[in-house]
Every structure is written in structure tokens, then in C-alpha cells.
Regions:
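Substrate-binding cleft of carbohydrate-active enzyme catalytic domains
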Residues: 1-131
């Protein structure tokens, strides 16, 4: 991801390699659909950019490849900016009309219910509207 180079580790497909894979698949009538797991399964992005995590996770070690069930903070504008950049770049690479965003195994009770920023957003979103 060009705008966020810390997201790229030592083992990755180049954009040229992805183009070859997509072309190979298309020749066999297979559509390659990219997947970006959010808001869970995000240890790699949190290891690179820990400020995108919930407030209570600041002191938790984030090592790529480990499952620690941490999530991106839902009330952090920087999360949305980074993911817009990622989605824009991925969309340009893949001809598919679809991007799979995951959404599974997001353990809210261990993350958003303990995060001060997320709690603030939840309270604002659940305020009763006047009759």
C-alpha cells in the first residue's frame, strides 16, 4: 500500500504479480475478489499503526501473526482515512466489482465496550430523538 508503507512486510505480492494472478484467473473464468478483514483480524495494521486501535489496547503487544482479538477503533477518523487509502488502491488493482471486508470474529465485548472513544460514539448514536 503505497500511502502506508509500514503495512507491507517482507513477504508480499507485488502489484505486477497480482496483475498476473488476476489475468491467469480470468483466463479460466475465475474472478479474484480481494479481502480486507475489518474491524477484526487487524493485528498487522495495529502493529504498524498502533494509534488506530482502541484506547485500552495501547499497552498490549501487537505481533504480526499472533491472534490477540484486537480491533480497529470505530471512533477514530484516522482509521477511516487509512482504509479509504487501502480500498482506493486495492480497487484500482482488481477488476472485480466486489471487495470482501470480513466483519467476522469481531469481538466487540473485548474491544469497543472497553474503549473510551467507542463508548462515546455508542452513547451519541443511541441517544433518543425527540418525539
Amino acid at each position: 500500500i503505497k500511502k502506508h508503507p509500514k503495512l507491507v512486510g517482507k513477504d508480499y505480492y507485488t502489484q505486477e504479480q497480482l496483475a498476473e494472478i488476476i489475468q491467469y484467473a480470468a483466463q479460466r473464468n475465475i474472478e479474484v475478489i480481494p479481502e480486507l478483514d475489518i474491524p477484526g483480524h487487524t493485528v498487522a495494521i495495529l502493529a504498524a499503526y498502533p494509534e488506530l486501535g482502541c484506547t485500552h489496547t495501547d499497552t498490549i503487544a501487537k505481533n504480526v501473526g499472533e491472534t490477540v482479538n484486537l480491533m480497529l477503533c470505530a471512533n477514530n477518523e484516522k482509521v477511516y482515512e487509512v482504509y479509504k487509502d487501502i480500498i482506493d488502491e486495492v480497487s484500482a488493482l482488481f477488476p472485480s466489482r466486489y471487495i470482501h471486508l470480513g466483519g467476522d470474529e469481531a469481538i466487540i465485548e473485548k474491544n469497543w465496550t472497553k474503549c473510551e472513544r467507542c463508548q462515546k460514539m455508542m452513547k451519541e448514536l443511541t441517544k433518543r430523538l425527540p418525539n
